[in-house]
Amino acid sequence: MGSGFGGSVAALRLAEKGYRVTVVEAGRSWRPEDFATSAWQARHLLWAPWLGWRGIARLRVRRRLVALTGVGVGGGSLVYAGVHHRPDGAVFREACWDPTLDWESELAPAYALAERILGTTRVPRQAAGDDVLRRTAAALGVPGAVHAARVGIHFGPAGRTVPDPFFDGRGPARAGCTECGRCTLGCRVGAKNSLDHNYLHLAQRAGAEIRPLTEARKLVPQPDGTWHVHTRHGTGITRTRTVLSAHQVVLAAGAWGTAELLHRSQPYLPHLSAALGTRTRTNREVFAAVSADGFDVGPGVAISSVLRPRSDLLVQLCRLGPGTHPAALLARPGGSSWRDFGRRTAVLLAMEQGDSHLTSHYRRGSLTFRPGGPHPEPVRLASAEAVAHDYALRIDGRAALLWNTVLRLPVTAHLLGGCPIGSRPATSVADLYHRVHGYPSLHVIDASAVPGNLGVNPALTVTALAERACATWPAADRPDQRPAQGEPYRRVRGDLSGTAQGA
């Protein structure tokens, strides 16, 4: 269920192991030329099928949360900036990560494999906006804290299409990045290493079937041990309903979609952990716009530089791309004109470690949220605002928080948790092999399984967790080496070489 960073890994690795794999994806499939040319093209950017919009991003506004999530074949990779950073090691030593494992060392080989398949590299060129971030760091007393971002983007000759440069000819042809800055609108060049260019492409070569515009609505276990997955195909008034039968089900619809599907299926899952919905997190994100008349952030990818003033805080320089932008409706800090807002505006995205969280509930057909503990998800981060205001000083501009202060709600593009992994059913939804407690043939392999805030963009970590989970699966014709649920954890040595299918 889902074709994002968890579902795409599962599709490839399980197809390689001899399973018959079907991927169900609520959104449509995309070609580079189908993506929006401007952020004003809502029907190509936003997912609102009741309006006829079938874009790559779904915006959900609730009483305590605003979340932006990806939709389409490739999931969040269609709308993400392509950033691949590993969390600070201290993240994995927080209490929310099950102490049974040394997570930093456990995930190290999975991170390395994920970086190879996703084509992780350093941004090779910097522009004026990046230089301002370096000067800001120096003014804050951390001159060595700015680095080029690590991203999954092909930096070949700009705009030139070449045969597959990543998988010995098994992947699709690719074009070099033109540094237009529109990565988050969907890459029209074909340079961003979205999942349709790697994991999903290889999964289809291995025999996996992908069904776009098909939404999973309900999971029902059967007496013979199989599952019935009730789906709905299409986005119009007339939709086709189909029931799929499977021996194993992987939930990978993202932190929102997976939690919502399990909440909706709860009447049929009496043994489901009461921890469902807990530890839902925003990654503690805040967005600030810094703009000035006469300033030009310069060409580049959507996120080109990162500043780490403290080990628990990351601030990233983001571009909107040239032209006007809907963000101007919420923040016009450097003058009254909306003209060319994207060119003269740097957006600073801050992420902070910390144990704040929400709990999701299912009400009237959708998720609602309540505080999950004494520490609320932040609307503002003083340390991030200090960076934004100092950046503004360097360009004689002004800084303004974007969505957070206007909506007075936590805003995230990286929703995490809700189905956390752990060894105890009382505090986790799935075990350390990602099998749902009480239902060992049901698996959670996506951002919903992440038990804590990461303080960095989560795509690489979700991919690494998925690689680790799938490596422990047996081949279709081999016995399962994982211990039965209820037995003590035992490390299962899986293959993380990624040699199958050239990946």
Where are the language model's segments positioned?
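FAD cofactor-binding and catalytic pocket of flavoenzymes
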Residues: 61, 76, 80, 92, ...
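Short, hydrophobic/aliphatic alpha-helical segments
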Residues: 53-69, 239-246, 309, 404, ...
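A glycine-rich dinucleotide-binding beta-alpha-beta segment and adjacent secondary-structure elements
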Residues: 149, 180-183, 220-221, 379-452
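Conserved redox-cofactor binding core of oxidoreductases
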Residues: 103-213, 406-413, 420
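A short acidic-Thr-Gly-centered motif at the start of a beta-strand
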Residues: 11-16, 199-204, 234-243, 421, ...
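Intrinsic disorder at enzyme termini
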Residues: 473-502
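Glycine-rich loop(s) and the adjacent beta-strand/alpha-helix scaffold that form part
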Residues: 16, 20, 27-32, 37, ...
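N-terminal glycine-rich phosphate/pyrophosphate-binding loop and immediately adjacent elements
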Residues: 1-95, 99-101, 105, 231, ...
